[in-house]
């Protein structure tokens, strides 16, 4: 909800490409978070469908992030047709695998869990980990673009660097969730994006745009 609420603020950016990128990140992440929340609220077969739609929204966040990072750092990858077509092909291929999961079950399966509360637990399969690995690699490419920009900037970008670091915290929680039953095994990335968005849009907006 925080990401969706921040969209009007992002729409005020003058640079059209940066505006499209950050709005895309906020929209995709907001939908991702909403579907994740809905997954724990509803019950029955619809829960699996909601989780599936959330997965697609989450993967879409990666591509919106790359578009934003390319535009914000002054690169042109987001304008190149070959890059656009290749990105679309990869995205659609992964979406197809996710949509057909009810048939092959290689992306995830479900089971009833009772700890720390009763919910429909997700057991991730091989395809999930492959796509998750790809997502982390692509996200890291975007992070590299930002860190390189801030490193070469004449401005004091330390607060912005800290904000970027917030994006990595949920990854630590994701890993911890694999090792302890006290944490639900879901992707916590939307929390990091929400923290980053609040920081760049409401706390350090001028510095963010000045760089």
Where are these predicted regions, by residue range?
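Hydrophobic alpha-helical membrane-embedded or membrane-associated segments
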Residues: 24-28, 59-62, 136, 140, ...
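Hydrophobic, aromatic-rich alpha-helical transmembrane segments
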Residues: 48, 52, 125-126, 156-160
């Amino acid at each position: 909800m925080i990401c969706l609420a921040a969209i009007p603020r992002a729409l005020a950016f003058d640079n059209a490409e940066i505006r499209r990128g950050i709005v895309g990140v906020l929209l995709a992440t907001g939908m991702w978070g909403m579907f994740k929340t809905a997954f724990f609220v509803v019950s029955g077969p619809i829960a699996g469908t909601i989780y599936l739609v959330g997965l697609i929204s989450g993967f879409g966040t990666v591509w919106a992030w790359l578009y934003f990072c390319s535009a914000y750092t002054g690169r042109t990858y987001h304008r190149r047709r070959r890059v656009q077509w290749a990105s679309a092909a990869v995205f659609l291929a992964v979406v197809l695998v996710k949509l057909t999961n009810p048939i092959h079950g290689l992306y995830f399966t479900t089971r009833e869990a009772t700890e720390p509360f009763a919910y429909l637990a997700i057991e991730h399969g091989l395809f999930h980990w492959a796509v998750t690995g790809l997502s982390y690699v692509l996200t890291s490419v975007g992070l590299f673009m930002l860190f390189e920009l801030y490193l070469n900037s004449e401005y004091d970008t330390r607060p912005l660097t800290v904000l970027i670091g917030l994006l990595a915290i949920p990854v630590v929680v994701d890993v911890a969730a694999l090792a302890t039953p006290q944490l639900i095994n879901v992707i916590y990335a939307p929390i990091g994006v929400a923290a980053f968005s609040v920081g760049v849009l409401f706390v350090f907006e001028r510095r963010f745009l000045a760089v």
